Structures are given as C-alpha cells and as structure tokens.
Amino acid sequence: PQDDKADVETSKILKGLIRNIEDQSNADIAYATGGESQTKIGLGYWRVTTEYVAPDSDDHEIFIRSIPNTFAVYLGKHIMPDGSDAKEGFIIDNMPVDTFKEQYPGKKCAPDEFDELGTEDDYWHTGETVTVIERYWLERRNETLYVLGDGTTMLKSFYDKWPQAAGERPAITKERPTHIEQLRWVKMTGLEVLDQRDLPGKYIPIIEVVGRVT
C-alpha cells in the first residue's frame, strides 16, 4: 500500500510537470498544427526540445514545438503509431541566407563555397536559402551491469569511476551483459557541422501524429 501511495504521488508530480511544460510552450499550437496536417495529408509531427531559459542563463527547460512542414521531417523505421521506437530522425530547414548569417556568423554560406559538392550543391544552396539538417539518433553501446552486495545495480563504466571520497566500493555479487543507448544530435549543412551534443532521453524527440491505422 505504501508503494501504491508513492506511485500515485509520483504520478501527480509528473502530470504537474507535464502541464507546466505544455503551458510555457503553448503546446496547443503544436498539437493543433500536427493534428491539422494529419487531417489534410494523413500525417503530422511535433517535437520536444530543450532550450536556454534566457540569453544570460545556462539553465535549460523543456519545450514542445510545432513542425509546420510535415515534408521537412523523416522519421526512421518504426512500428509504434507515435514513432516512439524509431532510432533516428531528421528535420530539414531551408533557411534564408540572411537568417543563416545572423544565426551562424562565420559559417560557409556563399554559393561558390558549395561548388565542391558537385551536382548536390543545388540541394544544399539555392542562392536564396541554405539547407540545414538536424539529425537525431540513438547510439548503442555495449555495457556490463553489476549487481552489488547491497542489492543495488550499477553499470561497469560508473563502477570503474567510483570516487575515492565515497569510500570502498561495494563488492560485486553478479554481472550480466547489457547495453545503453545515448541520444545524440547534430545540426549541419552540406559543408560543416553547426552544432552538436549528447542529449538526455531514450527516445527520438519527434512525435508522429497519424490517423486510424488499418
């Protein structure tokens, strides 16, 4: 019973956090945009991002954002209707050159700089726009899971880095092979990487909106 009460309280806290994220994101816009696209062409999307809370802050908060152009999204192979089992996803943005220069000063955007791409240069640069692609993917890494003497579990990579200040490491009573998946993200043009980082989470943060599947 105590665990049941704890689960209820945890559920209430999580629901409150989700409502807060939805409120500060104006998530209804993202939901409506995805739903409208699904109604018109049978498919829509919205996304989850982490963004700085202010220009002078290093703190991040979670936001729900719309993806107005369904055709700008490619979600990797998946079975679940919401795409939650996909292992990669792409979002394509044909960004006006002036906007690109403002957001990425010093990055290559002149038409002749794309000549080295050969016949593909027209895809990446039209003279008025630069194609910017965001890629999310889950990178799998083999691991070993330790069961410790106190009953807790710990990955070998963390166990090996046990800090001396924490005292003696607990004894290992059992181990088994396992794996972890790291969510990675990169934003790039056809010439260079604009930004990249590892992200928290175990899902591709692109949510697919579909109608009835038969």
Feature map (PLM): residue ranges:
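Extended alpha-helical, oligomerization-prone segments that build pores/tubes and scaffolds
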Residues: 1-214
